[in-house]
Curated annotation (Swiss-Prot):
Binding positions for substrate per the UniProt entry: 45-49, 57, 61, 89-91, 93, 95, 212, 218-220
Cofactor comment: Binds 2 magnesium ions per subunit.
Name recorded for this polypeptide: Trans,polycis-polyprenyl diphosphate synthase ((2Z,6E)-farnesyl diphosphate specific)
Cofactor(s) the record lists: Mg(2+)
Binding site for Mg(2+): 44, 231
Record key words, sorted: Magnesium, Metal-binding, Transferase
Length: 282
C-alpha cells in the first residue's frame, strides 16, 4: 500500500480537480442532458478475479478498491452528480464468517483511509443501509465521513453498506405505517410519492443508469424502488479490471438509449412524478 496522501479538511478551499487516467483517456463529450444524473454500480466479480489468479477471495476485494476510486474520478470528470456503490448487501451475511469479518473491516478501513481524499475532491459521502448487525466501528467511520463531507457538492457518493432494496422499502413502509397509526398521515392520502419520502435518502434522485460488472445480469436487490425506470448496462469486465473507461463506455451506451417511461415517444423530462417519487438536489 502506498503512503497515505494528506489532504486538507478546510471546507472553504476549492476541490482538487480529478486526476487524469494514466492512459491519457478523456471523458466522452456528451451533451449535458444526456449525462446520467444518478449512476448505480454493482461491483461484481472480485471473487472470480482472485480465483483466476489462484488468490484468496479477499485479494479480489482489495484489488477492487482502486477500481471504485478510479470510477469516482471518472464520474467527476464527466460531471455525474450522484453515484451509488453496492459495498455490502443484506444478503452478504450468508458468506463465510471469515469473509464477512474481512468485508466489515475492509469497508471500515477504506472509508477511514479515503475520507480526506474524497473530501478534498468535493465528494459528499452518504451511507444507505440498516445499522443492525454492522460493526460499530463501521458505523462510526461512515457517520464521520458523512459529517466531514456534508457541504460538498461536486459529487454525492452513496455508499451502500448492509443495504437491501426490499429492506429499504420495508423500512419505509413501516415508518409510514407508524405515522398513519399516530394520526400524522391519512391512509387515503398515501401515494407512491408519499412512500418515496420515507426512503433512506429521498433527496437523491432515481437511478438513470444501472451498471453491473462481470457479465452477470441481475439487480441483486439493489435500489429496487429507485431503478424502476433505469437503463441497464451489463459489462463483462470483472470489477478489479474495471476503470473509468468502462464507466464512460456505459455512459455512452446510456446516451444512445431512448427513454420512454411507458410512453410512445422518447421523454427527456423523466417519469411521472407519482412513479419517480421525491426527487431533488441535496
Amino acid at each position: 500500500m502506498s503512503p497515505k496522501t494528506v489532504f486538507s479538511t478546510d471546507t472553504h478551499r476549492e476541490p482538487i480537480p480529478p486526476q487524469p487516467h494514466p492512459s491519457g483517456a478523456r471523458p466522452p463529450q456528451l451533451p449535458r442532458e444526456l449525462i446520467p444524473r444518478h449512476v448505480a454500480i454493482v461491483m461484481d466479480g472480485n471473487g472470480r478475479w482472485a480465483k483466476q489468479r489462484g488468490l484468496p477471495r479477499t485479494e479480489g476485494h482489495k484489488a477492487g478498491e482502486s477500481s471504485l476510486f478510479d470510477v469516482i474520478e471518472g464520474a467527476l470528470e464527466l460531471g455525474v452528480p450522484y453515484l451509488s456503490a453496492y459495498a455490502f448487501s443484506t444478503e452478504n451475511w450468508k458468506r463465510s464468517p471469515d469473509e464477512v469479518r474481512f468485508l466489515m473491516g475492509f469497508n471500515r478501513d477504506v472509508i477511514r483511509r479515503r475520507r480526506d481524499e474524497l473530501h478534498a475532491r468535493g465528494v459528499r459521502v452518504r451511507w444507505a443501509g440498516r445499522p443492525g448487525r454492522l460493526w460499530k466501528s463501521v458505523i462510526k467511520e461512515l457517520t464521520e465521513a458523512e459529517e466531514l463531507t456534508k457541504h460538498n457538492t461536486k459529487l454525492t457518493l452513496q455508499f451502500c453498506v448492509n443495504y437491501g432494496g426490499r429492506a429499504e422499502i420495508a423500512d419505509a413502509a413501516a415508518a409510514l405505517a407508524r405515522d398513519v397509526a399516530a394520526g400524522r398521515l391519512s391512509p387515503n392520502r398515501v401515494t407512491e410519492a408519499t412512500l418515496a419520502r420515507y426512503l433512506y435518502h429521498p433527496d437523491i434522485p432515481d437511478v438513470d443508469l444501472f451498471i453491473r460488472s462481470s457479465g452477470e445480469q441481475r439487480l441483486s436487490n439493489f435500489l429496487l424502488w429507485q431503478s424502476s425506470y433505469a437503463e441497464f448496462v451489463f459489462l463483462d469486465t470483472l470489477w478489479p479490471d474495471f476503470d473509468r473507461r468502462h464507466f464512460w463506455q456505459a455512459c455512452e451506451i446510456y446516451a444512445r438509449r431512448d427513454r420512454r417511461y411507458g410512453g410512445a415517444e422518447p421523454n427527456p423530462v423523466g417519469p411521472p412524478q407519482s412513479a419517480a417519487g421525491a426527487q431533488g438536489q441535496d
